[in-house]
Regions:
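Extended terminal
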Residues: 1-3, 15, 30, 169-251
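N-terminal type II signal-anchor transmembrane helix
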Residues: 1-26
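Alpha-helical membrane-targeting segments
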Residues: 24-25, 69-73, 218-227
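N-terminal beta-strand/beta-hairpin edge segment
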Residues: 35-125, 131-133
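Transmembrane beta-strands of outer-membrane beta-barrel pores
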Residues: 84, 155-157, 214-216
């Protein structure tokens, strides 16, 4: 009986150490939202997914990853690389506490459609390429306690039921220190819409200032920006709004 127990323990240990990705990943994916992994190979520690798709069926490409074995002790150290028709993504993630996640050296270039929020109306289709670098992001309870992000939406456009709206280039910059987030969103002057927004937020509230100002008279453009608020007599839309105990917006 003792020998049998020893054999079972050794077998369990070997199975854990060389756990096939095709066995482990489906259980992980059940907890993930918005992503489907297929054509799995390798182990859970050094694995590959030949096909990565959104739940809507958009194919992103193939992914490889390296996962630290101390995940069994509750500590996650993950390196991930995605490359395919939708673009590429690289990043390193550490999770040493239940409610704290750290991302480092995130670098991506993805089709705008691949980054579309599930809450975006289906009739609106973002076009263009989104490039970004996030050297560091420390999240506590999903809130960015520390953040440094620089993202650019290049050749930005939106397909709408009324037509194709070109937006040029749009830059998003965000930083967070001491739990207070500051972000800006601004266009490059080449598109049909002047975009200028500034945001300040904390776990207690948020504030936004800015406006959307059309550079041309266009029905599709007017319908698009009307989704963000009432259109003023000059055709613009104010983005001024706040909620809770909002911090001040930096100039």
């Amino acid at each position: 009986m003792g020998l049998l127990v020893l054999v079972l323990v050794l077998a369990t240990g070997l199975f854990y150490w060389f756990l096939p990705a095709s066995v482990a990943v489906p259980f992980v994916v059940q907890r993930a939202r918005g992503v489907v992994l297929d054509d799995l190979s390798g182990t859970v520690w050094n694995g590959r997914a030949g096909r990565v798709m959104t739940q809507e069926g958009l194919e992103l490409g193939a992914a490889t990853w390296t996962l630290g074995r101390d995940v069994i002790l509750g500590r996650t150290h993950l390196d991930i690389h995605l490359d395919g028709r939708a673009g590429r993504f690289d990043g390193h993630m550490d999770r040493t506490e239940a409610d704290r996640v750290q991302w480092r050296d995130v670098d991506f270039r993805l089709d705008a459609a691949a980054l579309a929020s599930p809450g975006l109306p289906r009739e609106l289709v973002p076009v263009g390429v989104v490039e970004g670098k996030v050297p560091q992001a420390d999240l506590q309870g999903n809130w960015p306690v520390t953040l440094d992000a620089d993202v650019a939406w290049r050749a930005a456009a939106v397909k709408t039921p009324e037509g194709h709206v070109t937006l040029g280039g749009i830059a998003f910059k965000a930083s967070s220190a001491g739990g207070v987030l500051h972000a800006t969103l601004k266009d490059d002057g080449e598109g049909s819409l002047a975009v200028d927004a500034r945001v300040a937020a904390s776990p207690l509230g948020w504030r936004m200032e800015g406006a959307l100002v059309p550079r041309i008279a266009d029905t599709a453009l007017t319908h698009l920006i009307a989704r963000f608020g009432p259109v003023r007599p000059d055709g613009s839309v104010s983005l001024a709004r706040k909620a809770g105990l909002a911090p001040a917006v930096s100039p």
